[in-house]
């Protein structure tokens, strides 16, 4: 199966990010309308939000009016899989764009807004939001191998660099404090990225499936880390933090959170076939061991009382070594994962 299941899961995560900001329940209930190639929904103030585009244009100028109503918002899924788009112009009427709506536009090279746009600006075809100095969308069809995020940018939006396969190096300035969910997911040529000592939060799966990353260092400034941000990074061999990091620790390149003694990320590029989780660890995070193909055995101590979703996803060769009458034993049974006891004389394979 390889990583196909995790890519599918990641696409769901990206869509959930989009739905979260758009409030999916409301989207399902509200009525949508059509104007030419556009689908849109009415907002409470009488303006409209573009919810879909069905055209095949390569160079698209989004209208500022649809059926006589002002376009003020672009839904986060409006331009998904618009593979014909090469460039797009966003009108001054648009006031709201949250999660990258162009994440699946495989040929998109440039996003443009006017220099007088009240809410957004673009530099070299990359889209930013003025209010919070946030990078929203780096077009995935751009063929640059190196990109330097401008100084002064404070946030990288969820999915901002999603699946940008040409990039080998991204420089993040020390003005950035937030890296969103899936921000660099599937950037599989990315060999080097330095997280500055200004970042305080790293979102779910932020660097997942970056198959060329071999090492990464988390600075002392980082206070929050979501679901394994390095899941399924097949070449990643080590995660580093300083010995004095206030919130996180690493042992043999494996990342732990101090507050709840949780194992967050086991690098998928570690070549060892066996791993013993340290005694005293109480939790294994979501996707913590994702796509660790080389592992054949993980020993879980009786101190572990919580194991997250997909913690051992796509570990096809894995057998868990678990204590009798433990939480880990029940987890293995429930999830149909082969297991054995530490004495190795009582084998079960349910």
Where are these regions (language model features)?
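Positively charged n-region of N-terminal signal peptides that target proteins for export
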Residues: 1-11
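Bacterial N-terminal signal peptides
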Residues: 10-18
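Sec-dependent signal peptide cleavage junction
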Residues: 18-30
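Short N-terminal segments immediately surrounding and downstream of signal-peptide cleavage
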Residues: 27-39
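Structural signature of tandem-repeat unit edges
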Residues: 37-46, 55-73, 82-96, 105-126, ...
């Amino acid at each position: 199966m390889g990583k196909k299941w995790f890519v599918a899961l990641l696409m769901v995560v990206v869509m959930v990010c989009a739905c979260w900001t758009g409030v999916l329940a409301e989207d399902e209930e509200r009525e949508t309308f059509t104007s030419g190639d556009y689908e849109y929904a009415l907002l409470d103030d009488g303006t409209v939000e573009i919810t879909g585009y069905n055209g095949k244009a390569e160079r698209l100028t989004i209208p500022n009016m649809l059926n006589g109503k002002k376009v003020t918002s672009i839904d986060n899924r409006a331009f998904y899989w618009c593979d014909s788009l090469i460039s797009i112009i966003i009108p001054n009427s648009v006031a709201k764009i949250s999660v990258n709506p162009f994440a699946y536009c495989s040929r998109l090279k440039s996003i443009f807004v006017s220099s007088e746009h009240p809410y957004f600006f673009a530099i070299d075809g990359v889209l930013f939001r003025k209010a919070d100095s946030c990078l929203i969308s780096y077009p995935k069809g751009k063929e640059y191998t190196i990109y330097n995020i401008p100084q002064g940018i404070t946030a990288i939006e969820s999915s901002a660099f999603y699946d940008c396969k040409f990039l080998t190096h991204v420089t993040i300035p020390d003005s950035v404090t937030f890296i969103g969910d899936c921000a660099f997911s599937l950037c599989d040529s990315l060999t080097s990225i330095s997280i500055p000592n200004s970042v305080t939060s790293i979102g779910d799966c932020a660097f997942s499936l970056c198959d060329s990353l071999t090492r990464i260092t988390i600075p002392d400034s980082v206070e929050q880390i979501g679901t394994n941000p390095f899941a399924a990074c097949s070449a990643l061999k080590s995660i580093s933090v300083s010995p004095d990091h206030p919130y996180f620790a690493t042992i043999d390149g494996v990342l732990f959170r101090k507050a709840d003694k949780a194992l967050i990320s086991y690098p998928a590029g570690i070549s060892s076939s066996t791993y013993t989780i340290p005694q005293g660890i109480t939790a294994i995070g979501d996707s913590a061991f994702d796509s660790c193909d080389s592992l054949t055995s993980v020993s879980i101590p009786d101190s572990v009382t919580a194991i997250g979703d997909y913690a051992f996803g796509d570990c096809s060769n894995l057998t868990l070594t678990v204590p009798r009458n433990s939480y880990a034993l029940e987890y293995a049974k429930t999830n149909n994962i082969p297991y054995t006891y530490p004495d190795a004389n009582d084998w079960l394979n349910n």
